[in-house]
């Protein structure tokens, strides 16, 4: 992300196997900027709990909380599970989601049909949560929006994304994981 001009503030234990909610003091600088700040709370209440400590910095500002769903992710494979997960995230963070982003994928195994079929799941989640769908993402390296639309009409914005995140088994160089050198 830094290579494309994005300032990254991350916990000391980021990119390790430790899942400790340690936040660096530099995190507060994100609330002092005139531009946009984006926080990745993770996909459950653990990361959201950490975000909850910043409620005083957030509550009086204009913000959007995007609830990013992935139909292929365990624990939110159906709309009821997605609802329960969001409720736990909102309770832990003390913030309310404002939009849904349908980010269904299986990394390089994603195809246009999977994206198209995920839209009906996203619609069901949207109705249940009473939240609008902001967009449906697709990996631009693998397909185009026309590939997805070939399966039928989609009323939501299709948003191409470039994938920067690598799984631990993708990040191996010369027998060492890249994160071990950070």
Task: Give the positions of each predicted feature.
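N-terminal phosphate/diphosphate-binding loop that engages ATP/GTP or pyrophosphate donors
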Residues: 1-19, 26, 152
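Short, conserved active-site loop motifs that form the nucleotide-linked donor/cofactor pocket
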Residues: 6, 63, 158
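Switch II (G3) loop of P-loop NTPases
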Residues: 10-16, 35-51
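Short, acidic/turn-prone active-site loops that include or flank metal/cofactor-
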Residues: 13-15, 71-72, 164-165
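Glycine-rich phosphate-binding loop signature in dinucleotide/nucleotide-binding domains
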Residues: 30-37, 61
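Conserved catalytic-core segment of NTP-binding enzymes
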Residues: 45-153
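NTP-binding/hydrolysis catalytic cores, primarily Walker-type P-loop NTPases
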Residues: 130-139, 143-182
């Amino acid at each position: 992300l830094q290579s494309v001009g994005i300032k990254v503030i991350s916990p000391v234990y980021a990119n390790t196997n430790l899942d400790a909610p340690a936040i660096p003091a530099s995190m507060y600088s994100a609330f002092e900027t005139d531009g946009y700040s984006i926080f990745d709370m993770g996909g459950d209440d653990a990361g959201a709990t950490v975000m909850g400590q910043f409620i005083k910095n957030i509550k009086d500002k204009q913000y959007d909380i995007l609830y990013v769903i992935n139909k292929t992710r365990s624990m939110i494979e159906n709309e009821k599970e997605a609802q329960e997960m969001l409720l736990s995230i909102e309770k832990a963070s003390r913030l309310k989601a404002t939009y849904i982003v349908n980010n269904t994928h299986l990394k390089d195994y994603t195809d246009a049909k999977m994206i198209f079929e995920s839209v009906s799941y996203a619609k069901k989640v949207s109705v249940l949560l009473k939240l609008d769908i902001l967009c449906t993402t697709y990996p631009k390296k693998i397909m185009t929006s026309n590939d997805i639309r070939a399966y039928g009409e989609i009323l939501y914005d299709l948003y191409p994304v470039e994938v920067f995140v690598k799984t631990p088994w993708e990040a191996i160089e010369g027998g060492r994981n890249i994160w071990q050198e950070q």
